[in-house]
From Swiss-Prot:
Part of the 50S ribosomal subunit. PANTHER family: 60S RIBOSOMAL PROTEIN L9 (PTHR11655:SF16), 60S/50S RIBOSOMAL PROTEIN L6/L9 (PTHR11655). One of its GO terms (cellular component) is cytosolic large ribosomal subunit. Signal peptide: none annotated. It comes from Aeropyrum pernix (strain ATCC 700893 / DSM 11879 / JCM 9820 / NBRC 100138 / K1). The lineage of its organism: Archaea, Thermoproteota, Thermoprotei, Desulfurococcales, Desulfurococcaceae. The keyword Cell inner membrane does not apply. Belongs to the universal ribosomal protein uL6 family. Gene3D superfamilies: Ribosomal protein L6, alpha-beta domain (3.90.930.12). Pfam families: Ribosomal_L6. It comes from the Archaea. InterPro entries: Ribosomal_uL6-like, Ribosomal_uL6-like_a/b-dom_sf, Ribosomal_uL6_a/b-dom, Ribosomal_uL6_arc, Ribosomal_uL6_CS2. GO terms for molecular function: rRNA binding; structural constituent of ribosome. This is Large ribosomal subunit protein uL6.
Length: 182
């Protein structure tokens, strides 16, 4: 198995964003808020601040450490994008016969009358994520890309059609757009 002597990736920190590193815990603060993440599971990888950039590196890295260096650098880039502008997922409410009713109550997204069902379907909204319903669109926004994406996935999965032909029963709430808010 070949080893690389030194694998390094630099992530530039833009103006108005501050990054603090405590061991393997990275905290990124910006105009939209603050995101914190723990990378202590990444063995053999070092994270440090140098000038105006975050350096993610590994010495004598095998394939796993090389992959971790790139993944951690990508997570830090997403954290910086989030505190600068945020992330937005748009979902569309689709139905053919029974109109789907949705509402937001606290940390729950409640779906009623899905395929004419009397029971409610509930999707969990992750902390720090804002959900709005505008007509047949559901807009999910936040600064942590993973929480925003997980909330959108929870909403989409709550309307999964079971025991029916998906080609015929296309009712549901579907993600149709993802964007970084500038």
């Amino acid at each position: 198995m070949a080893k690389d002597v030194h694998v390094v990736e630099r992530v530039e920190v833009p103006e108005g964003v501050t990054v603090s590193i405590d061991g393997m815990r990275v905290k990124v603060s910006g105009p939209k808020g603050e995101v914190e993440r723990d990378f202590s599971h990444a063995r053999g990888v070092l994270i440090r601040l140098e000038d105006n950039s975050v350096v993610v590196e590994s010495f004598f890295a095998k394939a796993r450490q090389r992959a971790l260096v790139g993944a951690i650098a990508g997570h830090i880039r997403n954290m910086i994008k989030g505190v600068q502008g945020g992330f937005r997922y748009k979902l569309k409410i689709m139905y053919s016969h029974f109109p789907i009713n949705v509402k937001v109550e606290g940390d729950k997204f409640i779906i009623s009358n899905f395929l004419g069902e009397k029971g409610l379907r509930i999707a969990r909204i992750m902390p720090g994520v804002k959900v709005q319903v505008k007509g047949s669109d559901v807009i999910v926004e936040g600064i942590d890309v993973e929480k925003v994406a997980q909330t959108a996935a929870n909403i989409e999965l709550a309307t999964k059609v079971k025991d029916k032909d998906r080609r015929k029963f296309m009712d549901g709430i579907y993600i149709y757009e993802r964007e970084v808010i500038a």
